[in-house]
């Protein structure tokens, strides 16, 4: 199904629910996990996997939401500022674009890789412009598993951005994946409690540097943008 010339991957209701979460957080039954640097995290135990899924609410004080959305979607730029990226690319498979992402894990653990689809929509909700990105793992036989890398095939994420009414952004993220293998509990807790706020700080810096990155691309020999 297409909207204009854009393939619709996820149903409209998924985007509507994500918008609602930003304006009216649905946290009944969720456990408060941590709060740091303006970021609040809740978690919910998944009985099937024995892992947690997370809801993250926060603000990015000096970055506009349209820039955040562009940085979030720009894979080439991601490879420059995210040190955990080992390999990352987008490819066309059948009627949709698919992303392959190989993430560095600390030694002696194996890297994890993801094959997934995503969709971004710019929406109007309660009189506000909102950017919503939804991603989910996908089965793509032509991108087989690799030796020494663990394939994460149970992954879902939604990210919502809007203005904070000033010069920053309000953000909401819902995240779950099953990285498989024997990952220590302390590492999982660190990633959620410390890694998420730390990542958002790094992303905020990347957003500030995005205009300069685009200018450098335009000035590069052979540039077509």
Regions found by a protein language model. Give the residues of each.
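Eukaryotic helix-grip
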Residues: 1-225
